[in-house]
Amino acid sequence: MYTAKTAVMQAHSVGMHMSREQIADALIEASEGLIENVYYKSETTLPFKADLHQENGFLRGHDEGNVAVENGLKFHIDWLRGQKTGFFVDQRENRSLLEHYAKGRNVLNMFCYTGGFSVYAMRGGANLVHSVDSSAKAIDLTRANAEMNFPGD
C-alpha cells in the first residue's frame, strides 16, 4: 500500500518507543524512495504506567495528503484522527479475495470504517453493497472512497 509517501508507525511497548527514531530511519531507507514521511501515532497505545507523555506527530517529513492506493483502488485515509493507523493493511488480501466472490451478489460490510471491503466488492461486480458503521465519520469516509473510485455510481 502507498499512502502519500507516508508510513504510519504505532508502538505498543516502551522498547519500540525508545527505538522509534532508528525505526523511522530504517523504514525510509528500506523503502528505496517510496516513503519520505513517518507519522508516529502512539499517544494512546503505549503502556500508561511508563508515563512517557508521547504526543502523535511526524518523526520524519510532513503531511503530504492522505490518499492511499491499493491494488489500483484509492482510499482517503485519516491517520491523524482515524482509528489506529488509519487503514487496516493486514486486510489487503481479504479485500482482494472478496472482490473475486462479489460478482452478482449482495454484500453487507459491517463496521465499514474506510469502506475498503465495499469498494473492492463494487469493483468485483456486486449487485448491491450495504456499508454499516456506528460512526457517521466512517460512513462519510466510505462514501468519499466509493465516489473517488466510481464517480457517479
Where are these regions (language model features)?
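Non-catalytic accessory regions of SAM-dependent methyltransferases
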Residues: 1-4, 105
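Short, histidine-centered active-site or binding-site loop motifs used for metal coordination
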Residues: 4, 13, 81
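Short histidine-centered catalytic/ligand-binding loop motif
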Residues: 8-17
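Flexible, active-site-proximal loop/turn residues at the rims of small-molecule/cofactor binding pockets
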Residues: 13, 44, 135
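Non-catalytic substrate-recognition/targeting regions of SAM-dependent transferases
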Residues: 19-88
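Rossmann-like S-adenosyl-L-methionine
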Residues: 60-153
